[in-house]
From Swiss-Prot:
Full protein name: Collagen alpha-1(XXI) chain
Cellular component terms (Gene Ontology): collagen trimer; collagen-containing extracellular matrix; cytoplasm; extracellular region
Gene, per the UniProt record: col21a1
Organism from which the protein derives: Xenopus laevis (African clawed frog)
Subcellular location: Secreted, Extracellular space, Extracellular matrix; Cytoplasm
Annotated signal peptide: 1-16
Similarity comment: family membership: Belongs to the fibril-associated collagens with interrupted helices (FACIT) family.
Length: 957
């Protein structure tokens, strides 16, 4: 059973291919015939102006004229936007370029603010979302000012829905960053800028080429850091399935395919080029061959086998030929015979590159420009035949050669980026990768290795540039209604307008205001012959407007220009009302809006306005009897003609659909209810008034008194439809930012001043008893003084130490620290985080700090309080005065009483004698009387007590 299903499916597939081939046999596929949905999103804000908007419409007509219009081809939609978007032309509404052009020319300029994001969202929801064709979707956004709403996120949503966005900015007020946010990437392909609307015609051809690339070249080829639209013909012809032998290419790291007579590189053209070829492209091939005959490197055949496009080489004459289509003769061939071509036949590796445009073709060999030749106009190709590589002319036999690359790039600019670096002996860096068919890839495209360890933290960067302006804030609240702008020059006849409302019985009066929407200028100048001649055959014929030969029908045409009947059936669009007369409505929500379709009446009675339409326009009479002629393009406003004679009252038009509720207007007091009046005589039609805001439909009532004119507003000069909003509410304070990373170590600061002396440290532990020192040299003999006890002397030293030791230590520390070499201390442990401080204003990034100096060596702790001195040993007995020469050591004598101070001369110091034997401890003597105040050297006492220098390391001595 599965086998039967497989066979049936195969039969159906084969039949479907033949069906497609036969169906497309008479259709030349090209950019013109490619099916896609194309939507223009046009800026209709005040900054554009009516004249520039006319230029914009002509530009749209010129762009769309390059495509076949219809369900099988391109479908065009148009959205105009200002404060709100309006669906001017739905997708698929027209099936001919003439009808589409006429409808495009009839679009009326809106005026208002710039809400670009809202318009893009409107196109997504109301055009692309309703299209049932799974085709290329393209939107072109044209604007001349900064959007007053968010465009970035809405544009991202469009791209998620596979909508390609082009952005075209006009004038000096445009922001490049906003255009880049709207358009696809790269911006060099999808963003355009011109200085004014006159210059927009300069990008018409390049815009046509880009649109063709989107519809004809859907595939992408990875080249360097970007993807180029184009065709990899080797892959398209299934080279990997043909069992072609892989060999070494132009360089050792490149790989190529060896094509032999046993390998047939043939494929159905519809599978390789489903929409034909673009109007301009770059053909490139890297190859090596030894063939001495004529052969086709690449060719596209029609169903009958005739060549439509081909690149051929002639080994006998050493020439290269390019064949393509032609409108007159079907095909045209260009042969390059210059000496630069002959190097192709030296049996070495070479690169052939052809830059094909709509006007000419240029040959490059190994990146050297050889010659440029003119081309006749080219037409599309039949895709029902075959595409082949490496074939002899008019034969199916394959040629033996080696092929490394065969591609077509749809963007002509790729010709400037392409190099021949893969050819030995040429200069240039290979940015496109080493090969098209495999081998060792360049380092830049190798698969990533394992993630390495984090590197050291880099230095702080320089302060960043100021950030880009933030997104526009939310719309402000509606302000008080501005004063009504001063009426235009022809505003005086508007007084008779209320009589017209009375004739339509109240609510239908709003329909009349709907008829005034669009304000196309004075209708009398529609179709000046000069302007229509400039428009040419692109839909600017203005058939009826030019000749004015239809008499009464001409009058009817003038009336139709005011009514714009084609736009009345679109619900939700905002009309522009004239100067309000007796409103007849309650008026609680502002001026009544224009939801109706008054324009269908034709408004007879103003035949004098057209002026140039001939003498028949002087009398309205029975203008409804004839069929209205085709509408000509809107002409530029001119001097108003004389006021025509009132015609008979026309029939009451049908009531239009209710329009959307407009922004609330300033409330006005309700008029006094009057008696219902009889139908009044229709007055002369007033000139188009200043556009007002459409309010919600009020309760039906009788005619009231005319409301008072409002106060003059800030933007009332042209009756802007939008109410100026108040400044937006200040945004809430942002959330506190995250704690930043730890900064680098700061610059080493200068050495600080010595700090104040710290508190005396806690007493240290008692030191161990030191070894007994050697006996010092005897000092000079002093005068005999009063004998003092050891305890008394010790107490004096302790008192002196307590009084003077702190200052001595402090001075000693300062001296030692000023002389010692600062050593680098180890960094301390980070302290605990401090409490969160109040949020400060965000500062600019600081400059990177330098490394700080090493900290000072910490002060050593103060010495502990000296331990209690042991009891002194028993002093030895004083010996007798020795002679000059030392005598024998005598035995210790008994201490005698203190004698009077003797007056003697110091003797010479004798040699050091042997240490004496410690004498027996004698009984303590009696306390003597207090002696005179002596002078105790604190340093001696300090040394005696401490037995060492506390700032010196080493043994005690």
């Amino acid at each position: 059973m599965p086998g039967i299903i497989y066979i049936l499916c195969s039969i159906l597939l084969i039949e479907s291919q033949y069906y497609v081939a036969s169906e497309n046999a008479e259709i030349r596929s090209s950019c013109r015939t490619a099916p896609n949905d194309l939507v223009f999103i046009l800026d209709g804000s005040w900054s554009v102006g009516p004249e520039n908007f006319e230029i914009l419409k002509k530009w749209v007509v010129n762009i769309t004229s390059n495509f076949n219009i219809g369900p099988k081809f391109t479908q065009v939609g148009v959205v105009q936007y200002s404060d709100y978007p309006i669906l001017e032309i739905p997708l698929g509404s027209y099936e001919s370029i003439d009808d589409l052009s006429r409808r495009t020319q009839s679009i009326q300029y809106l005026g208002g603010n710039t809400q670009t994001g809202n318009a893009i969202q409107f196109a997504i929801d109301n055009l692309f979302a309703r299209s049932l064709r799974p085709l290329t979707k393209i939107a072109i956004v044209l604007t001349d000012g900064k959007s007053q709403d968010d465009v970035k996120h809405i544009a991202e949503e469009a791209r998620k829905n596979k909508i390609t966005l082009f952005a075209i900015g006009v004038g000096s007020e445009i922001e490049e960053s906003e255009l880049r946010a709207i358009a696809n990437k790269p911006s060099s392909t999808y963003v355009f800028y011109v200085e004014d609307y006159i210059a927009i015609s300069r990008i018409r051809e390049i815009m046509k080429q880009k649109l063709c690339e989107e519809s004809v070249c859907p595939t992408r080829i990875p080249v360097a850091a970007r993807d180029e639209k184009g065709f990899d013909i080797l892959l398209g012809l299934g080279i990997n399935k043909k069992k072609a032998k892989r060999v070494e290419g132009s360089r050792p790291r490149n790989k190529a395919y060896e094509i032999t007579s046993q390998i047939d590189l043939t494929e159905f053209t519809g599978n390789v080029f489903p929409e034909g070829l673009p109007p301009s492209y770059v053909f490139i091939s890297t190859l090596r061959f030894k063939i001495k005959k004529k052969w086709d490197l690449w060719r596209i055949l029609a169903l009958d086998g005739t060549i439509q496009t081909a690149v051929s080489l002639n080994g006998e004459e050493k020439t290269l030929s390019f064949t393509t289509t032609n409108e007159e003769n079907g095909t045209q061939a260009i042969t390059f015979t210059t000496p630069g071509v002959k190097k192709l036949f030296d049996e070495e590796w070479h690169q052939i590159r052809l830059l094909v445009t709509e006007e000419d073709i240029t040959l490059y060999v190994d990146d050297q420009e050889i010659e440029t030749r003119k081309l006749l106009p080219v037409i599309g190709i039949y895709i029902s035949g075959q595409t082949q590589i490496g074939k002899y002319p008019a034969r199916e036999e394959s040629v033996q050669f080696t092929l490394q690359k065969l591609r077509i790039y749809c963007d002509p600019e790729q010709n400037k980026r392409e190099t021949a670096c893969e050819i030995p002996g040429t200069n240039g860096e290979c940015l496109n990768g080493p090969s098209d068919v495999g081998g060792t890839p360049a380092p830049c495209i190798c698969p990533p290795g394992e993630k390495g360890d984090p590197g050291p933290k880099g230095d702080s960067g320089q302060p960043g540039n100021p950030g880009s302006p933030g997104q526009p804030g939310p719309d402000g609240k509606h302000g008080f209604q501005g004063t009504s702008g001063s009426p235009g020059i022809p505003g005086s006849p508007g007084v008779q307008g209320p009589r017209g409302f009375a004739g339509l019985k109240g609510n239908t009066g709003q329909d009349g205001e709907k008829g005034d929407r669009g304000m196309p200028g004075f209708p009398g100048l529609h179709g000046q012959p000069g302007i229509k001649g400039e428009m040419g055959p692109k839909g600017d014929k203005g058939d009826i407007g030019i000749d004015g030969k239809k008499g009464t029908k001409g009058d009817k045409g003038g009336n139709g220009a005011t009514g714009k009947p084609g736009r009345h059936g679109e619900p939700g669009s905002y009309g522009k009302d004239g100067i309000p007369g007796y409103p007849g409505q309650k008026g609680e929500e502002g001026k009544p809006g224009p939801p109706g379709m008054e324009g269908l009446r034709g408004l007879p009675g103003i035949p004098g306005i057209p002026g140039n339409d001939g003498a028949n326009g002087l009398k309205g009479e029975t203008g409804l009897s004839g069929e209205p002629g085709a509408r000509g393009p809107t002409g530029t406003p001119g001097i108003s003609g004389p006021e025509g004679i009132s015609g008979p009252q026309g029939p009451v038009g049908p009531k239009g659909n209710k329009g959307e509720t407009g922004p609330p207007g300033k409330a006005s007091p309700a008029g006094m209810k009057g008696e219902k009046g009889e139908m009044g005589i229709p007055g002369q039609q007033g000139y188009t008034g200043i556009p007002g805001l459409m309010g919600p439909k009020g309760d039906k009532g009788n005619l009231g008194e005319r409301g008072m004119q409002g106060h003059k507003g800030e933007h009332g000069s042209s009756g802007m439809p939008g109410l100026k909003g108040e400044h937006g509410v200040t945004g809430s304070k942002g959330e506190k930012g995250e704690i930043g990373e730890h900064g680098h170590r700061g610059i080493t600061g200068p050495r600080g001043e010595p700090g104040n002396m710290g508190l005396i440290g806690a007493p240290g532990p008692r030191g161990m008893s030191g070894e007994r020192g050697t006996q010092g040299l005897p000092g000079p003999k002093g005068q005999q003084g009063k004998e003092q006890s050891e305890a008394f002397i010790r107490q004096i030293c302790l008192d002196v130490l307590k009084a003077q030791l702190p200052s001595l230590i402090q001075n000693d520390i300062r001296q030692n620290c000023n002389q010692c070499k600062t050593q680098e201390g180890s960094p301390g442990l980070p302290g605990p985080p401090g409490p969160v401080g109040p949020e400060g204003t965000r500062g600019h990034p600081g400059l990177p700090g330098r490394n700080g100096f090493s900290g000072l060596v910490g002060q050593p702790g103060l010495p502990g309080i000296p331990g209690t001195k042991g009891l002194p040993g028993k002093p030895g007995a004083k010996g007798n005065k020795g002679d000059i020469e030392p005598g024998p050591q005598g035995s210790p004598g008994v201490p005698g009483p203190a004698g009077l101070p003797g007056v003697g001369k110091d003797g010479r110091t004798g040699p050091l004698g042997p240490p004496g034997r410690e004498g027996d401890r004698g009984p303590p003597g009696t306390q003597g009387p207090p002696g005179d105040a002596g002078i105790c050297d604190p340093s001696l006492c300090y040394g005696a007590v401490m037995r060492r220098d506390p700032f010196r390391k080493g043994p005690n001595y």
